[in-house]
Structure formats: C-alpha cells, structure tokens
Amino acid sequence: MTWLEISGTVGRVAACLGFFIAGMAIFYLLTKVIYRIPEKQQLERLHEPGKFRNAGIVIFGGVAAVLFTGFFGMGLQGIIYFLFLAVLTVVTFIDMDTMEIPFMLNVIIFVMGVVSLILQFVSDTVPGSEFLAMDEVTIVSRLIGMICISLPLYLIVLFIPEGFGGGDIKLMFAAGFLLGWKATVVGFFIGLILGGIYGVICLVRRSHGKNDHFAFGPFLSVGLAITLFCGNIIMNHYIDFIKAAMNPEI
C-alpha cells in the first residue's frame, strides 16, 4: 500500500508530511555520518561541511521518502530501497571529498542484497507474508549482476590503472547483487553518460589538468538511484527492440 491509496486528502497529506519528516531525520543523521566514516588519514582532505549542502541533503531525504513510499509502498521493499538510496548518498559525498568509497559501505549494500533475497524467498513460500514481497530478481540475475559491470571494470583497471577506482568496482559488484543485472547495466550506463558530460564540461572549462581525476562514484550512485524506478523497464524495452530489429516481420 502506498500513501496514494490512503483515502481522503487529509490522510494523504498527513502521510506525506510524516514520511517527509522521517526522511529528513534519517538524512540529517547522514550528514553526520558523511564526515565521520572516512579514516583519520583522510580527514585533512575534507573541507568543512557547508550549511547549505547539509540542508540540501536533509531536504532531499524528505522528498525521497515521499517519492519512495508513493512508488514502492510501505512494505520492506520500499524501506530497503530507501536505505540503499541513503547509502548511495553517503557514497556520493564521501567520494567527492576523499576520492575513495569506504569498503564498509559496499558491504552494507551487499548485505541489503542478501536480505532482499531472503525476503523474496519468504514472501514466495510463506502464506500471509505479502508485505515482505520484493521485486522478482532471480538468483541468477543477481549473480550475473555482480560481475556484468564489475568484472569489465576490473579488466580495464588492469590495463589502465587510473581508469576506475577500486571502490567503483566494489560498488557495482554489491549493487549488482541487490538489483540484478538489468538494473545494474542501466544504472551504470546512466552514470557513465552523466560522468562523461561532466568530464566534457571540465575539459571545456579547463578546471582539471590532464592528469587530474574526478570522483566517478557520485555518477554511479545517481545512475543506480534512477534505475530503482525504471531500470528493469528500460532494459526490457531495449531487449524487445533488439529482438524486433533482429526478427523483422516479413
């Protein structure tokens, strides 16, 4: 059930307000986590947290909570995906500040994948556990998702060491197990496009030197967040398009 299905305008507004406040509270805590997770040797590389940035994170959390409960409902799937977004938010800002993605954050995402797989199994086998229902992502899709992007990135790094960071590879590995291969591929290419656009802008403005790099984790995080809503749909349409192109009607 989503807040959109609540009867009465007052009830829907109250539900939205409650989710908005809850989301803001959770993301307010994230503004503290973002500056405490990095290791001590990285602290000198962190700039002082800006009030406007923190306020933006908090407001984003409130809006996201309303969107997620409206789209995914109030079951555990919506909760897991919202927590996934929360982790991606932490990944984004820590990577922006330190050019590194803490290993523990990727572990948390992988654990979310394990939990979602267990919930999916329980909801399919135990009567009356529909509230535990998750998207039907098969174990095969999850296993393929773990390597469909992370393995090519790893091979690229073997030949071009500065091509991608190890944190980026681990992020796609963990996210692949949570989302499955379709959403993971779509999320990666969305991130790749966004990162490419940013790189071109930096090149035009010459804000980065030839040997300088920018964090790619934030773009991957945005791509993965977007794909929560439409990743499988985009991939399914793409597959149907390819099939139609390969087998045109005579």
What is each stretch, according to the model?
Residues 1-250:
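A membrane-topology feature that recognizes alpha-helical transmembrane segments
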